[in-house]
């Protein structure tokens, strides 16, 4: 595989990608990819193309994501199971590209848009319940396939229909099988389960923790566990949820970075979170 000096690929309006996808506009930019809206001139439909930035590590991770997306799409209906429908993937101008259905804003951007326009009535209890049910349907489906999402957050839940309050779960780039060698650096910090923070072995329950944090956030308008430091986040978790379970103290490889032998939190952070992309604090 060759890698050009330019890490990002830019297109002009109406330019054809791979002779089939007519470029419309950029939708968003992430750490290792850019999402663009295109019109598929063959199938006569709008699509989203995720363009992976030109970097070997990003490429390798995206290949793993494609394999997982193919597996998930082959085992269930994306509409019934509320996950992203993938149409195609290909290599173009030394960039890997993933073509999927075009959805609307993610939960974070949508909520921010509503609050910026003084309209917070959309997220009623009834609508939150409806959205929650769809996310749970997706989680039940992937968990039955022995897959942990590992990065559930408002940015990874996209609205399908604002009117109908329908949504889909996206971004399986950090996902893994429960029997895999599990990574210590997963989940965005505000949605990170305590067993992950403390270096314990984890399973499907970490997705449920993230979902609980998301629901509290869209109901109250505030991030439940602000990520100014892991130390203060653990203090908030203990304050809201109660003491850390004994098994986490016993099994956690990172417990000594945060707690004394008396199970008291150190006053100052004693560990560095190496996942720099997870250090952003959100404000509505």
Residues covered by each model-derived region:
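Conserved alphaE helix
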Residues: 81, 94-97, 102-164
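Conserved catalytic-loop aspartate of Hanks-type protein kinases
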Residues: 207
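C-terminal lobe substrate-recognition/regulatory segment of protein kinase catalytic domains
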Residues: 244-284
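Glycine-rich ATP phosphate-binding loop
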Residues: 34-53
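Protein kinase glycine-rich loop
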Residues: 23-31, 35
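Activation segment/activation loop of eukaryotic-type protein kinase catalytic domains
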Residues: 155-188
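Conserved HxN/HPN-centered segment at the entrance to the catalytic loop
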Residues: 75-88
């Amino acid at each position: 595989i060759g890698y050009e000096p330019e890490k990002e690929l830019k297109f002009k309006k109406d330019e054809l990608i791979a002779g089939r996808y007519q470029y419309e506009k950029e939708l968003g930019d992430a750490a290792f990819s850019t999402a663009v809206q295109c019109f598929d001139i063959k199938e006569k439909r709008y699509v989203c193309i995720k363009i992976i930035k030109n970097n070997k590590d990003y490429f390798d991770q995206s290949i793993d994501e494609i394999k997982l997306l193919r597996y998930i799409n082959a085992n269930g209906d994306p509409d019934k199971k509320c996950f992203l429908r993938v149409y195609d993937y290909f290599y173009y101008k030394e960039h890997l590209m993933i073509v999927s259905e075009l959805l609307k804003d993610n939960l974070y951007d949508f909520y921010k848009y509503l609050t910026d326009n003084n309209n917070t009535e959309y997220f009623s209890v009834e609508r939150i319940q409806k959205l929650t049910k769809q996310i749970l349907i997706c989680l039940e489906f992937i968990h039955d396939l022995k897959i942990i999402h590992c990065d559930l957050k408002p940015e990874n839940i996209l609205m399908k229909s604002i009117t109908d309050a329908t949504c889909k779960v996206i971004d399986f780039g950090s996902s893994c099988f429960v029997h895999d060698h599990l990574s210590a650096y997963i989940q965005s910090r505000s949605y990170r389960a305590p067993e992950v923070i403390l270096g314990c072995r984890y399973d499907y329950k970490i997705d449920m923790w993230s979902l609980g944090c998301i629901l509290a956030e869209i109901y109250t308008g505030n991030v439940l566990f602000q990520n100014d430091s892991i130390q203060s986040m653990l203090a908030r978790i203990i304050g809201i949820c109660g003491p850390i379970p004994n098994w986490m103290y016993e099994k956690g490889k990172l417990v000594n970075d945060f707690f004394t032998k008396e199970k008291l939190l150190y006053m100052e952070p004693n560990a560095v979170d190496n996942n720099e992309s997870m250090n952003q604090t959100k404000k509505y």
